[in-house]
Amino acid sequence: YCLSDANLKYLICGAAVYKGCNRMAKRVILAVAGAGKTYHICHEIDPQKRNLILAFTHENIHNIQKELYDAYKCMPELTTVATFDSFVYHELILPYEPSIGEHFGQPGFVSCGICMIDPPPQRIKTKTGKSIANPLYEPKDQLAHYITDRKQYYCATLSELALQVKKKRESLIKRVAARLNMFYDCVLIDEFQDFREHDYDLIIALAKQLNDVVLVGDYYQHSVSATNNSGRPFKKKSVDVSYDEFIGELERAGFEVDITTLDKSRRCSTEVCEYVSNKLGIEIMSFGTNPGSVIWVDENASRVLEDPSIIKLVYKGASRYTFRAMNWSYSKGDTVDAACVILTDDFEKLADDSFSTNRISVVTLNRLY
């Protein structure tokens, strides 16, 4: 259906009269590793309502779809599942392309798709290592900042573009939120700790306008991804944002922060959770449903390395090893019967009572966690 903004406002007003004025619900659920974030999202939705579930990667989407099938034996007819990039492109960019063209003084602009290459950086280095202005870089107030010479949108700048555009004095975000509120009863975002910079800013800006939004994530799994792992909201300039500071920022943005619903791990045993809490200083408790122990391998290291049933977790470069290995960051969310964690020099004295995390980077700690 094609609706003008005027008709859209009329329909929303009509819906408000019909349904009554509901208080806007904005909730963040902070979880621990293995607590079942995706399980919770998929089993707590009302399948009779119009749900929009967003996630960062295609792997996240696959897990969500699988969980929905397990929960309801089919994909709920009124529930939409999409990656965040796909959502931004199809819901915030394409429907408003005429407004985008007008905003940048190019009425009649028509794009030619999207590309995954990165836009030109603002500065580049010469052969001698000197940093200079990049002649190919376009400023943010120009449409060329967001599209290629072939009029393809840069996927990397979709959120930045959505935040930039206005029609007269009304932001694109406000218009999009009004449309989303009409077509969806609830918006849920999984693994929200993976979103950074403009993506994060866009989520917060939209959430302020949406009637019902739920974000689920684990603060201590931020900066674990191989990409998109720096900047807002977990860094201010070069300083890491603490757990309590992060909660405070969310509350100031208007969210109710829930730290109890998913505060126990279903995957990890009591002993493993206690070890993580004591050694890494990250509070995590267990449901106690799975057995498991922390075993230091000293004498039988070769036997463990040669056992294909035990996956070896290495900091990076898993493909270089002859045994079955996976990088710490890529193992996030997986469930296995046995894993051998191969430690780096930072954790050489992890078994000692005097071990301290004071000089270990947040990124390294989160990856081991």
Segments the model singles out, each with a brief description of its role:
Residues 1-369:
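The feature marks helicase ATPase cores and/or their adjacent C-terminal helical subdomains
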